[in-house]
């Protein structure tokens, strides 16, 4: 029987907390999808959003699977990419909320509560939803984000321990380095455009926004724009530090975590806003029409995040290949589950010479494990 470490217990508690935090949101979405207008002031408006509700239900269901993968044995055997991509998006979406919500609360404390559109008050929030819906949804997102990201950090610390211990200078000077730097330059240009546009909107600018959206724009929306502007700058700054090997003695995990979170935010929120505004095809009020600048910024935001992901993936795959050894481990001493290579070396030493003779199939399997474990 395997003895659980304190980190294992925290990881398990965080993962199950994340699963529990999805229940209110999934229940609410399921009610809406089945025609129950709970917390909805305008049922006709909700009927137009069935596709968005279906998509968000699926996204939160994926979050449940991610949380389970961090504590179940099959999660340690799952291909890295199968877990990394959805978790990258989840980190970006939920991480942005975790940053924006406290800032919005601080703004409320400093400047007072906002009045509802039209100067009224009452219990109706934006979009025809009751205020309690936003408390349930974003309260759940906050708990889910903290718990899921905590579970993932502990999972990654075990599975990719060698990668997280390495330094920027350990990245190889590969033949694709010129391409990586070129793509990073494109990402930087796009990111600066995104940061400028989002910063302008955060400061109160209205050019490029739907007229009605600009008139009824909440303080929270401005805070979100400001956070995304910062994320755009942070993502490319971290990426440039990696591809140009800035301060090679520095731990790789610092720019890696920044690039991971910020690029995930750009990709996740850019994609989400394109979907939300793109699914509204029946626009009867000209003031709701979306100008061309807004989807252009969202597309640039999505592409920036995607470029950071691609360049980062190339760099890490090449690092994995450079650190792989013939016995199926990485030269930094970690295996697929992050344990020391020596743990398996002792077992191999007890085998007979015939048992230690690798077959072509086992060699391929161990090499694949080495690539994954090293990066």
Per-range role (PLM):
Residues 1-8, 158-184, 323-328, 332, ...:
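Membrane-interfacial, low-structure loops and terminal tails that flank and connect transmembrane helices
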Residues 2, 11, 15-40, 45-113, ...:
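Transmembrane-helix bundle segments that line or gate the permeation/cavity pathway
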Residues 17-28, 89-100, 138-147, 179-202, ...:
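Alpha-helical transmembrane segments of multi-pass integral membrane proteins
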Residues 27-39, 102-118, 196-210, 270-283:
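Membrane-helix interface motif
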Residues 42-56, 210-231, 292-300:
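Transmembrane alpha-helix entry/boundary detector in multi-pass membrane proteins
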Residues 56-66, 139-156, 227-238, 298-315:
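Hydrophobic cores of alpha-helical transmembrane segments in multi-pass inner/ER membrane proteins
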Residues 69-90, 240-263:
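Loop-to-transmembrane helix junctions at the membrane interface
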Residues 115-129, 214-216, 280-296:
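Short, membrane-exposed interhelical loops at transmembrane-helix boundaries
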């Amino acid at each position: 029987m395997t003895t659980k470490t304190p980190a294992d217990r925290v990881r398990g508690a965080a993962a199950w907390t994340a699963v529990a935090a999805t229940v209110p949101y999934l229940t609410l979405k399921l009610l809406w999808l089945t025609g129950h207008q709970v917390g909805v002031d305008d049922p006709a408006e909700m009927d137009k959003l069935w596709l968005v509700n279906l998509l968000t239900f699926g996204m939160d269901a994926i979050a449940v699977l991610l949380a389970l993968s961090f504590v179940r044995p099959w999660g340690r055997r799952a291909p890295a990419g199968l877990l990394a991509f959805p978790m990258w998006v989840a980190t970006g979406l939920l991480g942005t909320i975790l940053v924006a919500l406290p800032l919005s609360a601080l703004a409320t404390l400093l400047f007072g509560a906002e009045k509802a559109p039209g100067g009224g008050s009452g219990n109706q929030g934006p979009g025809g939803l009751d205020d309690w819906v936003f408390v349930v949804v974003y309260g759940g997102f906050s708990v889910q984000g903290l718990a899921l990201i905590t579970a993932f950090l502990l999972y990654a610390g075990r599975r990719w321990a060698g990668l997280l211990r390495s330094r920027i200078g350990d990245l190889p000077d590969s033949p694709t380095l010129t391409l990586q730097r070129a793509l990073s330059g494109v990402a930087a240009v796009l990111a600066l455009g995104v940061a400028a546009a989002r910063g302008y909107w955060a400061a109160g600018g209205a050019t490029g926004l739907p007229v009605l959206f600009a008139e009824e724009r909440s303080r929270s929306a401005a805070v979100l724009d400001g956070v995304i502007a910062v994320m755009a700058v942070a993502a490319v700054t971290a990426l440039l530090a990696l591809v140009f090997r800035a301060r090679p003695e520095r731990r790789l995990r610092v720019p890696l975590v920044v690039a991971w979170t910020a690029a995930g935010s750009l990709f996740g929120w850019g994609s989400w806003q394109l979907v939300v505004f793109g699914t509204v095809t029946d626009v009867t009020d000209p003031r709701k029409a979306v100008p061309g600048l807004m989807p252009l910024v969202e597309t640039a935001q999505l592409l920036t995040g995607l470029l950071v992901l691609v360049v980062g993936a190339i760099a890490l795959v090449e690092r994995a290949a450079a650190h792989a050894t013939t016995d199926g481990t990485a030269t930094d001493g970690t295996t697929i589950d992050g344990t020391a290579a020596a743990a398996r070396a002792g077992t191999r030493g007890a085998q007979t010479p015939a048992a230690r003779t690798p077959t072509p199939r086992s060699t391929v399997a161990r090499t694949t494990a080495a690539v994954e474990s090293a990066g």
